[in-house]
Structure formats: C-alpha cells, structure tokens
C-alpha cells in the first residue's frame, strides 16, 4: 500500500538535495508547507460551512438565500469577509485597548491548533500525539478565556455579561464532553485519534463507536453544540437579551474573527465526532464496500485505487463531517433558546450523570472483557 505522505516527503527531500538545501532547512520547509496547506484548507472549509448554513436556513424558511455572488452564491462568504476587512476598526474610548485587541486572537488561535491532531486520512495528520483527544479538549478550553477577555476589555455591561456566560457554559459542558471522550478511549485502548479510527475500522461499519456508544454519542452531540455556542445554546451572544454579547463593541475584521473562530470550532467539533464515533476516514459502508472489493480484483485498478486512496480518505472524512454539520445547522431553526438556569441544569444535572454512568458501564464492560 502506498503511503502518499511519505512519498511526497521523500520526493521533496530528493529535490532539496539536488538544490543543496540542508536537511534541517528542508524539514522546516516541509512543516511550513504542511501547516500552510492545512490553514488554507480549513479556511475554505469554513467558507463552505457559512454558505451551507445560509442555504439550509433559507430552505427551512422557504427563501432563496445567497444567489448573486458567484454560482448559487458560493462566494458570498468571501465577499462578506472582504467587506469586514475594509471596514473601520473602532476601539471603545474607555475600554482596555490591549485586552480588546487580544480577545479575537485568543479565540481563533487555539481552534487552529486543535487541527494538528485531526486525522483526515490514515497518514494525513500533522501531529499524531498519543494524547490527541485530550489535547483537543485542553486547547479548546482556552477559547472562553478569550471571550471573557474581550467582554472585559470592551468596558460594556452587555459584553462582560456575555463573556461571563461563555465561561460558565464552557465549564459546565467540558466535563461531560471529557467523560464521553474517556469512554471512547477505554474502548479503543488509546488516546490517539489515529488509533481510535483504526480500532473502529477493524470491524467495519458495525464497529463504529456510534453503535457501541449510543448514549455517549447523544451526550457528546449536545455538549459539542453547547461548546460551540450554537442554538439552542447561544446564550453568550443572545441578541434579544445582550445586544450582541461579547461582540457588541467590535467592528471590522475583529468582529469577523469571532465568527471565524465560531465556525472553526464547529468544523473541528464535527471532525472529532467523525473520528470518535463515525469511523473517521474508513469507508466501510455496506454495499459500497462490497462494490469496491469487486472492482479492486483487477491489478491495474488496484494500483489506481492505492494512488487515489488518500483523496478518497479525505473526501470520506469531510463528507461525514458535513453530513453531521447539516443536522447541527437544522437545530438552529427547530429548537428554541434555553434560559441560563436551564442550560446549567442540563449540563450539571442531566448530561454529567449520564456521561459518568456511560463511563462506568464502559469501564465495567472493559474489565469483564479483559478478565
């Protein structure tokens, strides 16, 4: 089986040798190129999510949605981003300029870092850490601090209240999220995202953790929506209550960065759902898998399939994640916003006991299996 990542790396190293570039410099160039490709790809993914949300929302409300900016309005998000980039950046007169500027950066940067441990294919990952899933939880917990800093630096009561809500919401739902991830790690025997996907692929479609951990999947789904501050859990920026929450005093590109961070977090969350519960890059779907086995009997076709394998893996991962995103977007128009007390009760009195009970059941099953 061809390892395409190693193949490309070896080709580049051979090219660097011909150009008499040192090994350390060539490795630095490879890391920079891989990171740049990931950032560009993730940014394009965010633009697609924004367009998809607008189109799905328009369909739910019997509207047309984006139409004029490109075919089917596909570049409307890019046009809006350029518009925000050209707008004036206003700083509140009595606000803290340093904290006001640091808020958007603290929100966006950690979310980009979490993509380091997301496997888009068997060998398509920037950093296969042994603690990949907990690295994601640890890094993503920094984001509410940025929202709190942004609200405090704005010197606005609505902004500060939105930041406090974001911090309370994150603390409430990170614990059930971590317990669900720990249950998956117990089943897989590893905290590595690659190992978790490979454990599921051993048993095909029915080996996905979605079937083995249905309770954990539901708890993870609700917790991830709350972590991403999606409706019905968008209390930190509730327009009817807090004007625009922590974004009230922001304008221009800083205002746009909050939305970029929100959609980056949503995409990362959907990718982790795919990795943890939906088999990752594994294409073990009934009927389609059998057809692929019949076609691959030819040696020529088999070699072609080996060459195309990384593309198929990336396409499979993204297809599953956008399929999950479709249901996340639908919740925006089907469920009403909850109150703050209902939000905290749901996290502490419902999801936490369920996630803890699911962890105990998983641990008991694991002990019985080993014994």
From Swiss-Prot:
PROSITE patterns per the UniProt record, alphabetical: COMPLEX1_ND1_1 (PS00667), COMPLEX1_ND1_2 (PS00668)
GO cellular component, one term: chloroplast thylakoid membrane
Keywords per UniProt: Chloroplast, Membrane, NAD, NADP, Plastid, Plastoquinone, Quinone, Thylakoid, Translocase, Transmembrane, Transmembrane helix
Entry superkingdom: Eukaryota
Family matches, as Pfam families: NADHdh (PF00146)
GO biological process: aerobic respiration; photosynthesis, light reaction
Subcellular compartments: Plastid, Chloroplast thylakoid membrane
Enzyme Commission number(s) from the entry: 7.1.1.-
Catalytic activity from the UniProt record: a plastoquinone + NADH + (n+1) H(+)(in) = a plastoquinol + NAD(+) + n H(+)(out); a plastoquinone + NADPH + (n+1) H(+)(in) = a plastoquinol + NADP(+) + n H(+)(out)
GO molecular function terms listed in the Swiss-Prot or TrEMBL record: NADH dehydrogenase activity; oxidoreductase activity, acting on NAD(P)H, quinone or similar compound as acceptor; quinone binding
Transmembrane domains' residue ranges: 29-49, 98-118, 129-149, 177-197, 205-225, 255-275, 310-330, 350-370
Keyword NADP: yes
Primary enzyme class: translocase
Membrane topology note: Multi-pass membrane protein
Subunit structure as annotated in this protein's UniProt entry: NDH is composed of at least 16 different subunits, 5 of which are encoded in the nucleus.
Purpose: NDH shuttles electrons from NAD(P)H:plastoquinone, via FMN and iron-sulfur (Fe-S) centers, to quinones in the photosynthetic chain and possibly in a chloroplast respiratory chain. The immediate electron acceptor for the enzyme in this species is believed to be plastoquinone. Couples the redox reaction to proton translocation, and thus conserves the redox energy in a proton gradient.
Similarity annotation: Belongs to the complex I subunit 1 family.
Listed name of the protein: NAD(P)H-quinone oxidoreductase subunit 1, chloroplastic
Biological source species: Adiantum capillus-veneris
